[in-house]
Amino acid sequence: MIKETFFHEEYSVTFGDDWNSCLYDRGAIEKIELNVPEIIDKYPYPVTVTVAYRSGEQYCWETKYLEVGYVRQFGVAVTADGNSVFAQTWENGLYCLDARTGAKRWRTKSRRGVTNVFVGKDYILCQQHNRALQLLDIQTGEVLSERRVTSWGFTSLNHRYIACEARVARWEIIEAATLKTVQSYSAREFTQGHEYHCVNLIQYRGNGMLRVSGFQNRHDGLPNDEFTALVSCPAMESPAAEG
């Protein structure tokens, strides 16, 4: 089975599911392929990774750190220069791998795994499940700062901001490089009255507007109750905030 990860025209975007895409600066890598063994008899199992560059270069290597389940959910984080690939794990933190050889450059150690990853110029923002947002030095993996949150993940909005349910029933727009909140909403405000629904898509539409969508399961055999809301975010209206 091959899992292909393509990159968007404007951003280097790696896809798990469409609703969980992650945004990165346009970069050197064009495509990543994961080839999983047909028979898996042990865990963790080796995955063959093919990294294709826009220059035409292509490298193939094997690793046990890049888990397909995570790729499907959260994508593959890479640096814009194409030198590093970041591998999330369920229990053992975050790995930084050489994109051309698969060699381990550094890893973080924690009791919780890592879900989303946002790659900046000299830092990485990652989420430790439902514990904290962490800023890491991109060269060493050293923790620069962290902020406690209750959610299991975040959504990248553009080159600068993320959206996160930082506390129960409280959504925040956070500047990735500083972990500072620039806009805060109650769950009712953020979903425009659908606070008991599950939010599964947040997109920045430009001009300070967010598109928020979600659903609520129905237990009577009927289709899910779905909603879509347009939410104003004045803090993202300025040209600088557009990223």
Task: List each language-model region with its residue ranges.
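Short loop/turn segments that connect beta-strands within the blades of beta-propeller domains
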Residues: 17, 25, 45, 81, ...
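Blade-level signature of beta-propeller repeat domains, shared across WD40, Kelch, NHL, RCC1
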Residues: 200-243
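Short glycine/acidic-enriched loop and turn motifs that connect beta-strands
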Residues: 20-21, 39, 169-170, 216-221
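Aromatic (tryptophan-biased) beta-strands that constitute blades/sheets of beta-rich domains
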Residues: 2-11, 15, 19, 33, ...
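Structural recognition of the beta-propeller blade-terminating site
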Residues: 53, 98, 137, 175, ...
